[in-house]
Amino acid sequence: MSVEEDATVREPLDLIRLSIEERIYVKLRSDRELRGKLHAFDQHLNMILGDVEEVITTIEIDDETYEEIVRTTKRTVPFLFVRGDGVILVSPPLRTT
């Protein structure tokens, strides 16, 4: 297979395949977001990410004023296994030609 054929996108998972060893953005259920280096994935979108920054957003309602209180929690994880059934969106890095 030539380099040109290897770099083409014919199926949705091809776009993710081209992002191996690059930083990607993953949005998960439960208002979780991940940014990390993609090391491996499969057809179920199970992924192994390295150097991961996880952001968890929680929204609470104040009992007295009924205002929304938005809180974000961040953590850094060296390696993370992401189960594919919780993945909503995968965004590859921006590419400039």
From Swiss-Prot:
Origin superkingdom: Eukaryota
InterPro entries, alphabetized: Lsm3 (IPR034105), LSM_dom_sf (IPR010920), Sm (IPR047575), Sm-like_LSM3 (IPR040002), Sm_dom_euk/arc (IPR001163)
One Gene Ontology cellular component annotation held by this UniProt entry: Lsm2-8 complex
Compartments (UniProt record): Cytoplasm; Nucleus
Modified residues (N-acetylserine): S2
Boundaries of every Sm domain copy: 11-96
Expression sites by tissue: Expressed in roots, leaves, stems, flowers and siliques.
Pfam families on file: LSM
CDD domains given in the database record: LSm3
GO terms of molecular function: RNA binding
Keywords in alphabetical order: Acetylation, Cytoplasm, mRNA processing, mRNA splicing, Nucleus, Ribonucleoprotein, RNA-binding, Spliceosome
GO biological process: deadenylation-dependent decapping of nuclear-transcribed mRNA; mRNA splicing, via spliceosome
Family according to the record: Belongs to the snRNP Sm proteins family.
Protein task: Component of LSM protein complexes, which are involved in RNA processing. Component of the cytoplasmic LSM1-LSM7 complex which is involved in mRNA degradation by promoting decapping and leading to accurate 5'-3' mRNA decay. The cytoplasmic LSM1-LSM7 complex regulates developmental gene expression by the decapping of specific development-related transcripts. Component of the nuclear LSM2-LSM8 complex which is involved splicing nuclear mRNAs.
Subunit (UniProt): Component of the heptameric LSM1-LSM7 complex that forms a seven-membered ring structure with a donut shape. The LSM subunits are arranged in the order LSM1, LSM2, LSM3, LSM6, LSM5, LSM7 and LSM4. Component of the heptameric LSM2-LSM8 complex that forms a seven-membered ring structure with a donut shape. The LSM subunits are arranged in the order LSM8, LSM2, LSM3, LSM6, LSM5, LSM7 and LSM4. LSM3A subunit interacts only with its two neighboring subunits, LSM2 and LSM6A or LSM6B.
Name of the protein: Sm-like protein LSM3A
Species assigned in the record: Arabidopsis thaliana (Mouse-ear cress)
Lineage start: Eukaryota, Viridiplantae, Streptophyta, Embryophyta, Tracheophyta
